């Protein structure tokens, strides 16, 4: 998820979710991405996040947190210092599951880690990797065709076009444009942003994206949230994502507002 917090990523989120008051702070030791809307703190409609020295980030977070009613934060690898501070102030975390692929592995090992039935499906056709800004328009049309309507503003698509230009994203699509995905790359991480298909298997899209992210030097590829019970569609999507290998990681999620 760390790849989503570039300047363009934050601008995209504000186009998508509305204006936030930027309270982010940084120096040579750390960077804390945090914004305020009303009395709610988040990372511009995503979890608050820090890079670098957590102790410096905690001091900054404490100053910003004062007077806020609620917060959205993910504690990685157990209860970190900011998470402990939130628990001490009465906040209760819940587990958040996400699927992450280790791109330091070799390509043959990554292929072997996939579900056996996926290994052949991944080679069903040869997808194309694109960073051409104009291709965002073709992806937008596919998105509209699959959804039956336009689900977000033109400005969000314009921001993703800028992300392609800046090298912070890439598109993988089938030769026929019947399937495509958008992937966000930044800070050595790659995140599966969105994918759409008109019935064509998406397995080659994901496998090509994993290999391309590794080629770009990314060390991790995050497939996204894992849901194990409840909504059948979300459970099915999660099962599909797990088929590409990796491990299911647990973060502690503090989120006391919708």
Task: Name each model-derived stretch.
Residues 1-39, 78-199, 212:
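A conserved beta-strand-loop-helix scaffold within acyl/acetyltransferase catalytic domains
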Residues 18-20, 66-69, 215-218:
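Short, high-confidence coil segments that cap the C-terminus of an alpha-helix
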Residues 31, 42-43, 59-64, 167-258:
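Aromatic (often tryptophan-rich) hydrophobic motifs at membrane interfaces
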Residues 45-84:
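A gly/proline- and charged-residue-enriched helix-loop-helix capping module
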Residues 52-55, 76-82, 137, 199-200, ...:
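Acidic-and-aromatic substrate-binding clefts and catalytic sites of carbohydrate-active enzymes
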Residues 53-57, 152-155, 201, 205:
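Soluble or luminal CAZymes and related metallo-dependent hydrolases
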Residues 54-65, 83, 122, 157-161, ...:
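Short amphipathic alpha-helical segments and helix-helix/interface helices
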Residues 69-75, 130-131, 171-173, 220-224:
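A structural signal for short, well-ordered beta-strand segments and their strand-loop junctions
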């Amino acid at each position: 998820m760390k790849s989503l917090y570039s300047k363009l990523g934050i601008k995209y989120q504000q186009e998508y979710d509305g204006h936030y008051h930027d309270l982010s702070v940084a120096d040579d030791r750390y960077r804390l991405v945090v914004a305020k809307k009303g009395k709610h703190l988040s990372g511009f409609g995503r979890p608050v996040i820090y890079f670098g020295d957590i102790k410096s980030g905690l001091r900054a977070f404490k100053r910003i947190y004062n007077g806020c009613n609620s917060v959205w934060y993910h504690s990685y690898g157990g209860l970190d210092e900011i998470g402990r501070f939130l628990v001490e102030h009465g906040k209760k975390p819940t587990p958040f599951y996400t699927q992450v692929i280790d791109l330091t592995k070799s390509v043959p090992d990554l292929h072997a880690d996939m579900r056996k039935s996926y290994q052949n499906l991944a080679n069903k056709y040869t997808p194309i990797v694109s960073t051409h800004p104009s291709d965002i328009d073709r992806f937008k049309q596919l998105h509209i065709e699959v959804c039956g309507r336009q689900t977000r503003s033109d400005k969000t698509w314009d921001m993703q076009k800028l992300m392609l230009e800046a090298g912070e994203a890439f598109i993988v699509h089938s030769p026929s444009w019947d399937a495509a995905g958008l992937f966000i790359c930044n800070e050595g991480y790659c995140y599966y942003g969105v994918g759409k298909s008109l019935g064509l298997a998406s397995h080659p899209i994901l496998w090509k994206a994993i290999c391309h992210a590794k080629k770009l030097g990314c060390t991790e590829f995050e497939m996204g949230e894992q849901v194990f019970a409840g909504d059948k569609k979300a459970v099915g999507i999660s099962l599909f994502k797990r088929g590409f290998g990796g491990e299911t990681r647990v973060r502690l999620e503090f989120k006391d507002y919708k």
